[in-house]
């Protein structure tokens, strides 16, 4: 019998949250949080992505290129031969990822002669459009937009009417047929999930000892209200099913009711406690907030050493690894600020300069039928032993020492 743990989705999010973006909780997870709910072992989770958790069909989004992190547009351009540009960065909330993105963008601005006007929208679609209109009226030169997908059609119209170039960050704007409609720098969540599965299947003995694979529970903690998180969990599960179709009953699918560390904490703790016969676990938390909750659950249950946690995102993990904390968090796919904002900065400045147009920008990477190019930054699994080398290599690609 398939052991799905499906936590019923509530309609509290009419829009899509963005990859690894921080949720609505900055509090430490509490085992007594009254906002959590259990799930049924027999119910099927809802899905906002392609495919479903119970399906063996490939649910990958249309594949773009998984590119080298450097966009390669800067070259020998003298950015200081012109007046400074003003670039508006509009983002969903003040989560650590967006703080890091803003800082990285400001650093690129010092090298590429632009200032940054950054504004958070508190996940309010109306506020997003207000910010965009206000910045259009101020006469900013370009936009980088990292917000909820329901605003995309209107923001696209507004910026086309204003004649101001923009690039979506993290979340592409797809039409009903799945075609990308505006330049975007994005994280390939499906590939990241697949990479995570490959990594743990190759490396789990180093962390879980001589446990037989058939005895290990594979828990995926996701949030299917948001497509980008669904893609990550789909990538991980599709790859696992492809390699080990006989281990379907080892999968435990936890679909959270909200983007919350607390709910992740309670859900992971309940799943582990409710399946006491499973001695070893691998937990893939598709967002770093969920990984924080999972880490705390592992600690509170005194299961460090018999459970390992994997995630996508790095704002908390790199700091904890640097402090030799959370030994159960063993690997992740970074959403690194230099990769994302370096490519985005190079792209938007090329558009504002007129060196590139929406049609020519990264055209060699464009998928058939797309109106504009979706540029995927590279995905790579790193550990506490390799993450510093990863940071140094990616930063060096963008000239950061």
Residue ranges of each PLM-predicted region?
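Hinge/beta->alpha junction and helix N-cap segments in small-molecule ligand-binding domains
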Residues: 90-102, 118-127, 170, 185-195, ...
